Amino acid sequence: MRIGTRGSKLALAQAEKVRRLLKEQGVEATITVIKTSGDVQKDSPLYMMKGYGAFVREIDDLLLKNEVDLAVHSLKDIPTVRPENLVTAAVLKRESALDVAVIRNAERLADLPEGAVVGTSSTRRAAMIYRHYPGLVTKDIRGNVDTRLRKLRDGEYDAILLAEAGLIRLGLDLKVERLDPYNFVPAANQGVIAIVARQGTPEAEVVKELNDETTWIETRVERIIAAGLDGGCVVPMGVYATRVGDEIDVIGEVLSLDGRQQVRVRETIPVAGCEEHAKQVSEKLVLAGGLKLAEEARKELDR
């Protein structure tokens, strides 16, 4: 099998994990590195990259042309609307959904002095910093994890925010502050590796063996809630679902770009019929003003 992926250290680590799991199933695979528009436009904030997913488009194009058999993506990078004949055939077990702060001269974000600069390329993380740490300032940061850590060490930032799962996959044992997911609500599908295939192909059937059912259910619920508010990477929105037995604890939150306004819904829903219940949670977010906040954020960023 031919696995298509981006060329960053993190993307290669994710693809290598899939290749290793396939080998354990007796399936040999090779890795093909593909440059995406998200890799090329390194100086643009992520919210300025419009259209079909900046980090997945070119890889999916090659998948559709049968030049690779599988694509390995971070699930949160995959748009809600996508080519009909591509499917997410499997998701691997989620290692962590949490955001973490890597801080230069303090133990916690709360210990940083007023005016300290926090690096993030996410409108969601920036809005949550403004809400929970109003004395701090955010500044856009791009580049791979190594580049961001170097910028932190060089003093361009006092702290940077990253996904914990990425640090785990890269084998980086850093001193971090793990941010409470019920205050600092993660992005929908954060921390999940997805394997995409052409619908109805033998490859799609083979990789189904790697699917983690609990992660599949949790991420499906998160995705439905986010879709109800058209919550792409532009919107300051977090959605986090955790399954415990036959129930799923769900929290959805939308913020204004400055973090001052917040719409939040938290509920426990049953696993049985969870997709319909997720739609209801999304509708509650909309009725509470979440869609209005999301639309205002999009308009402000388009100016």
Curated annotation (Swiss-Prot):
Q: What biological-process terms (Gene Ontology) are attached?
A: protoporphyrinogen IX biosynthetic process
Q: Which residues cross the membrane?
A: none
Which SUPFAM superfamilies does the UniProt record give? Periplasmic binding protein-like II (SSF53850), Porphobilinogen deaminase (hydroxymethylbilane synthase), C-terminal domain (SSF54782)
Citing just one GO molecular function, the answer is: hydroxymethylbilane synthase activity
Q: What is this protein called?
A: Probable porphobilinogen deaminase
Q: What is its EC number?
A: 2.5.1.61
Keywords in alphabetical order, please. Answer: Porphyrin biosynthesis, Transferase
Q: Which family does it belong to?
A: Belongs to the HMBS family.
- Residues with the modification S-(dipyrrolylmethanemethyl)cysteine, per the entry, are C233
Q: Which PROSITE patterns match?
A: PORPHOBILINOGEN_DEAM
Tell whether Transferase is among the UniProt keywords.
Answer: yes
Catalysed reactions, as listed in the record: 4 porphobilinogen + H2O = hydroxymethylbilane + 4 NH4(+)
Query: Which source organism does the UniProt entry give?
Result: Methanocella arvoryzae (strain DSM 22066 / NBRC 105507 / MRE50)
Q: In which pathway does it act?
A: Porphyrin-containing compound metabolism; protoporphyrin-IX biosynthesis; coproporphyrinogen-III from 5-aminolevulinate: step 2/4
Cofactor binding description: Binds 1 dipyrromethane group covalently.
GO CC aspect terms: cytoplasm
- Please indicate if the UniProt record lists Transferase as a keyword: yes
**EC class (word):** transferase
Other remarks in the entry: The porphobilinogen subunits are added to the dipyrromethane group.
Identify the cofactor(s): dipyrromethane
What this protein is reported to do is described as: Tetrapolymerization of the monopyrrole PBG into the hydroxymethylbilane pre-uroporphyrinogen in several discrete steps.
Recorded hits in PANTHER family, A to Z, give: PORPHOBILINOGEN DEAMINASE (PTHR11557:SF0)
